[in-house]
Amino acid sequence: MAAQKKKAQDEYGASAITVLEGLEAVRKRPGMYIGSTGERGLHHLIWEVVDNSVDEAMAGYADRVDVRILDDGSVEVADNGRGIPVAMHATGAPTVDVVMTQLHAGGKFGGENSGYNVSGGLHGVGVSVVNALSTRLEVNIARDGYEWSQYYDHAVPGTLKQGEATKRTGTTIRFWADPDIFETTEYDFETVARRLQEMAFLNKGLTINLTDERVTNEEVVDEVVSDTADAPKSAQEKAAESAAPHKVKHRTFHYPGGLVDFVKHINRTKNPIHQSIIDFGGKGPGHEVEIAMQWNGGYSESVHTFANTINTHEGGTHEEGFRSALTSVVNKYAKDKKLLKDKDPNLTGDDIREGLAAVISVKVSEPQFEGQTKTKLGNTEVKSFVQKVCNEQLTHWFEANPADAKVIVNKAVSSAQARIAARKARELVRRKSATDLGGLPGKLADCRSTDPRKSELYVVEGDSAGGSAKSGRDSMFQAILPLRGKIINVEKARIDRVLKNTEVQAIITALGTGIHDEFDITKLRYHKIVLMADADVDGQHISTLLLTLLFRFMRPLIEHGHVFLAQPPLYKLKWQRSDPEFAYSDRERDGLLEAGLKAGKKINKDDGIQRYKGLGEMDAKELWETTMDPTVRVLRQVTLDDAAAADELFSILMGEDVDARRSFITRNAKDVRFLDV
């Protein structure tokens, strides 16, 4: 890629920048530009800068991006692209100043003569927003035969300085997020790693290096995530490394196979039912699509869509075109080859996509994203374009691979049979309307409020805890659903078995939304769904089973932020002549104990510190005061920032592959933080 850098420096020059407005609005309302000022918004700063570097790679000017999380709280992103222009802009300022200080000053806003045909990150917008939300930003540019440097103090530019002569080109940006704006300025290595890995999958041949320099010598990890790992290091190299004063956590992402490697990665904990990965693409005026796909023996669909490398969590027209073509092609093939009788009803999309792992990546010159977060592609013309490409290519593949095609069709037919067998169970669940929970006597203790926005459903493990929760709740807005029997592991069961499970029926009926294609979020009866289980291993297992059910059957509940985990306390500190205190961790227990003793309090001798083994040990008053009272409780919202990572996690934890699960647990045994999946 780098060797093929185009000599079109002028096309991405001062004239390609169109200034629209300044940055003051960004600091006043940062959430409008980066989604939030929490952890997600903080990481969004990195994505915006990295997206610009990836734009250079997509345009054919760069083949390497280096990201460093530094010890002083800053992040540095470097690429070997053309470098941000430094020539004087029409406004009288250097172009780099315009890019860094004016909103919507990106190259792509100049129309046909702009720097990029296709762009993922809001080039210029993103960097200026990052600048606006940083206390300091430094940019080093190699371009026009020289090195250039510029710094910004709270978005105010210093002087652009020309440095030494150089033959290389590229841009390095380093920024310090403003702690007055963000709730936290602590970056999560795994969050960054997952996103960068995704970008490497989507840009075949691009190398992305991630280095975390915050770690200590004891935390060294040097992992090359690639089909072609580096050669083993010699004894001399190892000795030199160990003598180095500061070691870092490092990962390299490089995928020569692109989307094919992505599908291999998704299916690596599953059992593919055909060997070859289906891989094809197509180009049209202003559009480009690439798709890789492979079926596995599981029961869940795992389709991930991207537009201009942006993860379109909510799908859009590219996914609609793919689904339509796939359903049509498989049904036609099945009928033509007599794998499905003429009198048989057509296979549904759900039947066909059972066990399908697929990645759909489109590049669109003028994308229309629905919603501020850009997670759904809205271009209507993309649907027919993708549909046409998929129809042609999938038809050709099925005809050319009859043995694999038969296995795929037979799996879909088997899924259809299970669906038909499940219809009665599904209708039974549907008939038990949200107001008349026939067949579920005494289970759901509903709330008096009929406003879903104010209503909460606590799904509680066990009858004893359910009893305490019913007694301790505020019945105006809190409903309680105690679970008595075992929740089925939906990762290992088809829908007909899942819907026969009494506890699953109770949950689906109480929520009121339906499942899969029949899911309707407007019918949700509670806008907060709180999973409340014991803080021990068994409780965590129950929570994981419930999360797997919601993820596989009612994923929009998680996507829209309706699912929460209650955080019951682990300890109760009983003081003499003082009210008891509750601790939610060992550290908090120690802190409360130390503070209380310093304040002259005395702890009860025999049972001063009580460790709760389960929710059932708490009476109704304690449960309300610690876990259910909205003014004091701690709820953890379950998020879905990375559907592919969540999909993989559920497959590992709840699937058939024992070795993968053992390996995962061994690797993560020391990390006791809950995984926000």
Curated annotation (Swiss-Prot):
Q: Which reaction does it catalyse?
A: ATP-dependent breakage, passage and rejoining of double-stranded DNA
Residues covered by region (Disordered): 227-247
UniProt remark on cofactor binding: Binds two Mg(2+) per subunit. The magnesium ions form salt bridges with both the protein and the DNA. Can also accept other divalent metal cations, such as Mn(2+) or Ca(2+).
The alphabetical list of record keywords is:
ATP-binding, Cytoplasm, DNA-binding, Isomerase, Magnesium, Metal-binding, Nucleotide-binding, Topoisomerase
| GO cellular-component term (any) | cytoplasm
Q: Which organism is it from?
A: Mycolicibacterium paratuberculosis (strain ATCC BAA-968 / K-10)
Gene Ontology process terms (BP): DNA topological change; DNA-templated DNA replication
Tell me the compartments it is located in: Cytoplasm
InterPro entries referenced in this protein's UniProt entry, alphabetically: DNA_gyrase_B_C (IPR002288), GyrB (IPR011557), HATPase_C_sf (IPR036890), Ribosomal_Su5_D2-typ_SF (IPR020568), Ribsml_uS5_D2-typ_fold_subgr (IPR014721), Topo_IIA (IPR001241), Topo_IIA-like_dom_sf (IPR013760), Topo_IIA_B (IPR000565)
Binding locations of Mg(2+) 2: 534, 536
Q: Name one GO molecular function term.
A: metal ion binding
Enzyme Commission identifier(s) = 5.6.2.2
Q: Where is the Toprim domain?
A: 455-569
The cross-references to SMART domains, in alphabetical order and at most eight, read: HATPase_c, TOP2c
Describe the family membership recorded for this protein in Swiss-Prot or TrEMBL: Belongs to the type II topoisomerase GyrB family.
**Named cofactor requirement(s):** Mg(2+); Mn(2+); Ca(2+)
Q: What is its main location?
A: cytoplasm
Q: Which residues form a coiled coil?
A: none
Q: What else is known?
A: Few gyrases are as efficient as E.coli at forming negative supercoils. Not all organisms have 2 type II topoisomerases; in organisms with a single type II topoisomerase this enzyme also has to decatenate newly replicated chromosomes.
**Residues at the site labelled Interaction with DNA:** 486, 489
**SUPFAM superfamilies per the UniProt record, alphabetical:** ATPase domain of HSP90 chaperone/DNA topoisomerase II/histidine kinase, Ribosomal protein S5 domain 2-like, Type II DNA topoisomerase
Assembly mode? Heterotetramer, composed of two GyrA and two GyrB chains. In the heterotetramer, GyrA contains the active site tyrosine that forms a transient covalent intermediate with DNA, while GyrB binds cofactors and catalyzes ATP hydrolysis.
Its recorded name reads: DNA gyrase subunit B
Q: Which domain of life is it from?
A: Bacteria
- Decide whether keyword Cytoplasm is in the record: yes
